[in-house]
């Protein structure tokens, strides 16, 4: 009941959607679905783990909304999308939503590359810090820099595998949680931080595909 009719999320019900709150909504929906869906259905004595499955309607609407509104240079807020408030907090929210969903792209946007490009442009040349604009908290270099580093640091995690998204149905995603669980288990066995992603066949370049040792 907090989701806006557009699919995005505001700070409270009735607020216009913002980038930071929509990212928080996407991440929260994913976490809730993971915990609610621990037990897969059983039909005729067989576990139904490998059949096409859809994201929840709420999550799908939020991701579609976000794909059309994504920006790396400002926190899209309100009808004019001119928000500079909580920009670095917002970018960390983008990173969380991207990682938790395993999405390389939001809409047509390679969110990590666009975010990195912008952060490198905004870094202070002498101190190496980041400083936010027109917002008291992020005007403190320590806060803005912390969020920037949280965004950038995940880019150093090796991509161990990727899902190849194709077609208009969900045949490519027979077991939505399978790769996520496999990577999580491998992390523990190897004692190393790893990540995975979904690459869209329409948007991904050859270099994008070559980043993943395994493509499923």
Give residue ranges: language-model regions.
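An alpha-helical repeat/solenoid feature that recognizes helix-turn-helix modules
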Residues: 1-117, 121-160, 170-174
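Aromatic-Pro/Gly-enriched surface loop or interdomain linker
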Residues: 156-214
